[in-house]
């Protein structure tokens, strides 16, 4: 489950794995990423098992994303 690329939209985190699979999670699951600037989100480091954003000190494992682990303080936004 090695990540090859990570990207954020306004609503989702998308991580592409070495096997071609894409893991997509709601961005609100990770408040640090949700509130980060586009530049901070674009600056990430890959490891064999996850993604690290050094400017906001956020580390996410692929396994955690797959099982639906949300960061502490994650609150689903109200529908608009």
Report residues per predicted region.
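Motif-centric detector for short Cys/His coordination patterns
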Residues: 1-80
